[in-house]
């Protein structure tokens, strides 16, 4: 759905109003959920207002959410899918063909790596991994004539590396390739990759956009760009309709409702996370903290330039006691529920090595076994700090007790 052309209004105003117009028939302030599979025609191929025929092709609830998200990302069109991985799969299949080469930043989400490494490789798509977030390293990884996509996640999952999107975009342009940025962690409340030169943005709307851990979804937002004789929007629209992994009306409604409060929620996620990061940094029983809001983060200055309004709600750290201490910490915490996924109002913790990045185990890009990822929620900051203090205290005494398992390689989610 094409977004509003009014880009002068503030982020919070657009989040609430773009694509979310009162119902013209009843005057309902909140647009209704069009929970329907098909639409009545007044005659053969004579469609009513909106041109809706079948909900796989278009649905007013989904289209409204797509317009809303496109506005926040400063894109020309957005496309909503049934999951973040469905969105990534649709985007890559829309632009790639056998013989193409994909460049992946080292710290991309494990599911993205698995999709490219184990699924697309069977269709003649090769890939290389950049050993860092550096655009110079990305340029050296490009294969002239065959590299079609550069895929970047910034801040990255789970090590919170920050990349220079504009520099990566120049590398992509020089290679005649597309730059895709996974903006799930930053969200359009903090970062707009399309304005920095990216061609497309991918989201797991399950995370901060939905924001309440009650919906599964994904989205792709594109700017006005052409690829192999068609616009990116045309390619994505065909892929969405032809393959059908669309967001259902109720899921689109939940995502749209979450998006309305995204700017406000991200303020609290960011402020809580910054305090938690400083708290962890001050502890002798924590040996490493990854958060771009910390001044000693290697890309702090870059993060301050590219992220506006905060540094995000995700932190990762390594306790002094190693993997057993990491397992004890997540078992002992009462506020941070042990779970995959992130971005909800409630706080979550996980051990990425076996819970979210198991596809990396045994590779050069395996994440540390003792790394703990925190999705810092909206609870009172005093409760965060008290709970972390208790859980870290338990982790420091890990040698006195058995440590429960937190999962195995079978798990692989956000």
How would you name each of these model-derived features?
Residues 2-7, 24, 78-285, 290, ...:
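Conserved PLP-enzyme active-site core in the AAT-like
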Residues 38-89, 111-118:
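Conserved N-terminal alpha-helix of the aminotransferase class I/II PLP-enzyme fold
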Residues 15-29, 324-361:
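C-terminal core of ALDH-fold dehydrogenases
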Residues 38-39, 222-227, 259, 319-322, ...:
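Short loop segments at secondary-structure junctions
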Residues 254-264, 312-320, 373-377:
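Short, well-ordered beta-strand elements within core beta-sheets of diverse protein domains
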Residues 1-51, 289, 400-414:
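N-terminal glycine-rich, Lys/His-bearing helix-loop that initiates the first secondary-structure elements
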Residues 274-334, 338-340, 359-363, 400-407:
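Conserved small-domain helix->loop->beta segment predominantly found in fold-type I
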Residues 117, 126, 331, 347-414:
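PLP-dependent enzyme catalytic core of the Aspartate aminotransferase-like
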